[in-house]
Amino acid sequence: FMNAFLIASLLLDRRPPRMKPSRYPAVSILIAAYNEEASIADTLRSIANQDYPGAFEVFVIDDGSHDRTAAIVDACDHDWLRLLRQPHNAGKSAALNRGLAEASHDLVVTLDADSFLYRDALRNLVERYMSDPPNTRAVAGTMLVRNSRRNWVTKAQEWDYFHGIAAIKRVQSLYQGTLVAQGAFSIYDRATLVEIGGWLDCVGEDIVLTWAML
């Protein structure tokens, strides 16, 4: 039934096509990191390889890590990168709110410290946001399992991501009603984030944030 509904919705899709804007806006990227020494370098490398035509700034908020996360970020030589240190582990919401307070651009992207972006990911996300109706305040990025062919567990996770996240979000977007813009990769209107008070300190902070925007 889910697949049939998805196909029917795609055939009847009236969502505006994704267009290239005349000017790509500057964006602020927030990455909350806690003990992410195994992945943070790859995440930053994927950002450095983006083909995004506009400017961007990246804030890695080290949430009191006990490993080499902060040292790895500090060693990266990028003029768009800033490391913010939390004095102790206060949770992901507090880290993101710290980054939001420092962000200087009107569009804010959240990215997990173990997310890896395809080269065109940021450009596609911004184009989708800019092409949607003027009252759009957030757009969820596409999420895939990076190691989906490794074993049966990752294959099962890929299936869960497709039906539980990708397919459902695709259908919701056709009706301009995405219920969750996941924190792993989404874009938000900064003024709206500030207006609703940012991220609440709770489990599923991205869910609560999205619902506050609806």
Q: In which residue ranges do the predicted regions lie?
A:
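Short aromatic/hydrophobic "clamp" motif used to bind/position activated sugar donors
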Residues: V108
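The conserved acidic donor/metal-binding loop of glycosyltransferases
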Residues: D112-F116
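N-terminal membrane-anchoring/stem segments of glycan-assembly enzymes
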Residues: F1-R23
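Long helical/loop segments within the catalytic core of UDP-sugar-dependent glycosyltransferases
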Residues: M2, S93-A95, R119-V203
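Short, acidic, metal-binding catalytic loop of nucleotide-sugar glycosyltransferases
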Residues: R45-A55
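A conserved acidic beta->alpha catalytic loop
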Residues: D62-A71, H88
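Cell-envelope/extracellular polymer assembly enzymes that use nucleotide-activated donors
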Residues: P25-S28, E57, V208
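Acidic helix N-cap motif at the loop->helix transition within catalytic regions
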Residues: S39-D42, D67-A75, D120
